[in-house]
Amino acid sequence: MTRVKICGIRSLEEAIAAREAGAWAIGQVFAPSPRRLEVDIAAAINRELGQSILKIGVFVNEEAENLRRIVASCRLDMVQLHGDEEPAYLEEVSVPVIKSFRVRGSLELEQLKRWRPWAYLFDSYHPGVYGGTGESFDWSFLQEIARQERIILAGGLNTENVGRAIHQLRPLVVDVSSGVEYPSGGKDPAKIREFINIVQEQAT
């Protein structure tokens, strides 16, 4: 069954809304972004959440020492590397790693296997932007990889297209951020519930 990660969580209220709707994990962004979360705030949120939901930290080209400090301070369960990190970098991380790739054409599975992460995340490509664009991409590039590896699908997912994405790829996880937000920003609990309900319906 495909799981749901709600990314760009910025408050305890948003985290609880995701947990109560049935999300598998929340994503907390520690990289330059409108959804960036300060370390002390993330640590406070995660103390309240305890082990009730997985907490995944999103990083872009972060120094390994600083990443390890944030993982410990915020009690992160996993990290998502969303930048240009090389395969050797993964060996410096003490928790499971999700490695992100921005898709702009065909993908070579053997090249991707150099990283050996816990899972591969695929997002849409936009020059100079590391995720969170709200844009989707051609999922057909991922069909072979999805049959062989754990994949997480991101990039422009919403209540209108997530059912089709799951039917086409059967990813381990779907990752959503802007697709469950209010027009003014911030997570919309009703959209989170609707999104997760659609994902769960695909398993029946």
Curated annotation (Swiss-Prot):
Xref: Pfam families: PRAI
Domain of life: Bacteria
Keywords for this protein: Amino-acid biosynthesis, Aromatic amino acid biosynthesis, Isomerase, Tryptophan biosynthesis
Gene Ontology MF annotations: phosphoribosylanthranilate isomerase activity
EC number: 5.3.1.24
Gene Ontology process terms (BP): L-tryptophan biosynthetic process
EC top class, as a word: isomerase
Biological or metabolic pathway of the protein: Amino-acid biosynthesis; L-tryptophan biosynthesis; L-tryptophan from chorismate: step 3/5
Catalyses which reaction(s): N-(5-phospho-beta-D-ribosyl)anthranilate = 1-(2-carboxyphenylamino)-1-deoxy-D-ribulose 5-phosphate
Similarity comment text for this entry: Belongs to the TrpF family.
UniProt xrefs under HAMAP family: PRAI
Protein name as catalogued: N-(5'-phosphoribosyl)anthranilate isomerase
Organism: Syntrophomonas wolfei subsp. wolfei (strain DSM 2245B / Goettingen)
